[in-house]
Amino acid sequence: MYSHIVNLKSKTYLMTQTTIFSKIINGQITCEKLHEDELCIAFNDIAAQAPVHFLVIPKKPLVSLYECLEEDKDLLGHLLLTGKNIAKSKNLKNWRTVINTGEESGQTVFHLHIHFLAGRKMSWPPG
């Protein structure tokens, strides 16, 4: 089991394979899967905030964007392009992309994930 400690803005989190997302990656929990490859998995959000709401998550256990390093730039690009390709396959031309980083931003699962939301007019500011 992979685990490490991450200090995220003076709060320490232990990243283990115990998040709901790591259980999805490991096949312990089923999901409405939209895509999977060697780097990531994408699935519909069970608590959808828009008519179309899916997540793209890396298989690499990263707590948040705050933790990402220069070496993760190809992975981050892959996650975004995977989401774009899923959106295009759903014939979407407009969508919102969201990455919450840390508790104050609304991150509730401490495994990096990118939200893709569409199907309605989005308001601004979002929060």
Model-derived features: positions:
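HIT superfamily nucleotide-processing domains
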Residues: Y2-G127
